[in-house]
Amino acid sequence: MSEVSNEAARRRTFAIISHPDAGKTTLTEKLLLFGGAIQMAGSVKGRKAARHATSDWMALEKERGISVTSSVMQFPYEDKIVNLLDTPGHADFGEDTYRVLTAVDSALMVIDVAKGVEERTIKLMEVCRLRDTPIMTFINKLDREGKNPIDLLDEVETVLGIQCAPVTWPIGMGQRLKGVVHLITGEVHLYEQGRNFTRQDSTIFPSLDAPGLAEKIGTQMLDELREELELVQGASNPFDLDAYRAGQQTPVFFGSGVNNFGVQPLLDFFVEHAPPPQARDTTGRRVEAVEPKLSGFVFKIQANMDPQHRDRVAFMRVCSGKFTAGMKALHVRSGKDVKLANALTFMASDREIAAEAWPGDVIGIHNHGTISIGDTFTEGESLSFTGIPNFAPELFRRARLRDPLKLKQLQKGLAQLSEEGATQFFRPLMSNDLILGAVGVLQFDVVAYRLKDEYGVDAIFEPVSVTTARWVHCDNPKKLEEFREKNAGNLGIDAAGQLVYLAPTRVNLQLAQERAPDVRFSATREHAYATAVD
């Protein structure tokens, strides 16, 4: 096997998806703790700023620049290298979160045992569906009272439309929590509260019949458990590796992240069964991870809010080959060879200069405004990775200037911020309005702040009568022109020059779709096929 094949086979690149407060940050810390990346959980700081008011958050971010460290964490576990990509939760949720999911090979879904499947989880699952991303599920907060585990599995199957295969099963819950049973190995892991946030290996009995177990959990509980397990194993699906890797089945684990309980069986199972880096589609051909030449795409750009250094870091997922420090690569969109100097790698909580990186790894490239989201880098081959979409925004505002003479700076600022993925920017065909689109409200605050700070533009964002947007395509140029003439009042151009239908209401969108059967209305737009226009 080649060096690239060996290294690729060791990589596990994934993201954690959850609704805010399901325990994602805590679980992230505990995975790093069990992975040996940190000695004491709590030293990886989540975006605690999300708990402050928005204004505090901006001031905080300004003081420290945005911390890049919370975005990618790499740690070794057994003989594997795990890359954990953070998906921002809370109010700073934006398209960023969706796009991180295009850069991973699998995902871990965290569900609060008391709340079950929540709205954000449903949205993130839809994004995973676009690429049939394999998903494991961790039902968290087992140390509190929650829903019946069988009902929870049923809820996941019904609401998210994915088959569940329980791998561990709880023995009690809340005050009565005694441990979990591993349904595949038969082992019983007893519950002991994690002390001082240090790694804690729980007491393990080899089976339900092991001597001493009945004394530990009580004979009555053991009898109830046997009955419940018979029911569960009769009614649920056994784990099927192929179905999991095809995104059709999710293995389910139970535990309590805050108490370090149930994390170890999850991590062991994850590194054994989660997929290594997979082949990826491009505009030209399918690129296999084990190919010798480097290729990768940018899925996120993180701006540094320090005005002294206008540097931005572009996060590139390596898809094939080997990256070595200082190597030259083709920036496909511009056609220029670029020296990838001082690229960063992220080891738990440190930024380090990357000496090398392999398929599945993520490196940070310094970017002075020339790199956009979706850009591909290769060792000379002209191809672009597909599957890095823009998502139709759900919130819209019109930008208005306090000083009309700053129009040029406003247009420049919006164009650059939309390239970076901070917002989307539309120009209606029939007016001079500048309309911004976002997935989360905080995106508007970030844009307003950065326009003022970086471009000297004081803009007000007003409500606008747009409810949703769809990119429009038609293979017949004559039909497209007809559609354009009839609907000019609702059409606009995005920052990449693509035609967009800006619908004032959902009903209006439905009618437009019915009246123009030859026109495709799309809720996502591929970066690979966008052609930038000024």
From Swiss-Prot:
It is found in: Cytoplasm. GO terms for biological process: regulation of translational termination; translational termination. InterPro entries: EF-G-like_DII, EFG_III/V, G_TR_CS, P-loop_NTPase, PrfC, RF3_C, RF3_dom_3_sf, RF3_GTP-bd. One of its GO terms (molecular function) is translation release factor activity, codon specific. Residues 9-278 form the tr-type G domain. GTP binds at residues 18-25, 86-90, 140-143. Increases the formation of ribosomal termination complexes and stimulates activities of RF-1 and RF-2. It binds guanine nucleotides and has strong preference for UGA stop codons. It may interact directly with the ribosome. The stimulation of RF-1 and RF-2 is significantly reduced by GTP and GDP, but not by GMP. This is Peptide chain release factor 3. It comes from Xanthomonas campestris pv. campestris (strain ATCC 33913 / DSM 3586 / NCPPB 528 / LMG 568 / P 25).
